[in-house]
């Protein structure tokens, strides 16, 4: 079995490309892979987002607004997760496409329109958005990210249980994530090669304990 933790900016254009392209190549491993997509909000990820959008990172008001925006989008994504893997991933990709790529304003109307397109329960979604459960799930994701040493988005941690290792491989940034399909091969030699090539950190399996394995997206 392969366990993948993918950390993203829920309205990030770079994260959109990472999810849409490389992850589509993982479908042939569908029976072996458990994928979890977790939103990440921290100073570094917000800074990267601002830089990509040509925002002044020294503008504290602008930084605060961007942080709140990513946080709100993260809660919306976590609320969508409560309605299942297909709805959540569809909603996430729509958010990233419209807000991150097309640069539409993140608004109540847009969120409702995009969620309605997923065929999820809109009334339930609106109730869940600010619920304590959703906030708790979001904070759990931030704890997992911290334990795994995640600082930027997109990043991923891959556990290949077919290899004799009790740690995962950390891929930081879009370029590193190009190695994701190769890490899903069950060859121990291949895993070791990519591990050396990327000089990656080694998160321990203990970090898996804080993750809700019911929220599996692939």
Pin down the residues of each PLM region.
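N-terminal cysteine/histidine-rich coordination modules
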Residues: 1-6, 32
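Generic hydrophobic segment detector
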Residues: 2, 52, 65-97, 185-218
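C-terminal cap of thioredoxin/glutaredoxin-like
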Residues: 5-7, 21-26, 102-218
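Short, thiol/selenol-centered motifs that function as redox-active sites or metal-ligating centers
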Residues: 9-19
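Short beta->alpha junction loops/turns
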Residues: 11, 81-84, 131
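Flexible, glycine-rich phosphate/dinucleotide-binding loops
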Residues: 13, 44, 165
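Structural alpha/beta surface segment adjacent to cysteine/selenocysteine redox centers
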Residues: 17-103
């Amino acid at each position: 079995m392969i366990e993948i933790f993918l950390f993203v900016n829920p309205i990030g254009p770079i994260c959109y490309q990472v999810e849409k392209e490389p992850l589509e190549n993982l479908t042939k491993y569908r029976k072996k892979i458990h994928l979890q997509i977790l939103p990440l909000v921290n100073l570094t990820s917000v800074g990267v987002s601002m830089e990509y959008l040509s925002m002044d990172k020294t503008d504290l008001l602008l930084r605060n607004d961007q942080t709140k925006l990513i946080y709100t989008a993260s809660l919306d994504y976590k609320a969508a997760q409560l309605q299942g893997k297909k709805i959540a991933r569809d909603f996430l990709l729509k958010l990233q496409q419209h807000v991150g790529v097309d640069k539409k304003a993140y608004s109540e109307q847009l969120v409702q329109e995009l969620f309605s397109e997923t065929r999820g329960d809109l009334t339930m979604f609106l109730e869940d958005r600010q619920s304590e459960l959703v906030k708790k799930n979001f904070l759990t994701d931030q704890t997992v990210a911290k334990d795994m040493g995640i600082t930027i988005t997109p990043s991923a941690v891959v556990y290949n249980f077919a290899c004799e290792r009790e740690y995962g491989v950390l891929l930081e940034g879009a370029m590193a994530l190009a190695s994701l399909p190769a890490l899903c091969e069950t060859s121990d030699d291949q895993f070791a090669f990519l591990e050396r090539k990327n000089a990656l950190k080694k998160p321990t399996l203990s970090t898996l304990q804080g993750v809700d394995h019911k929220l599996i997206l692939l």
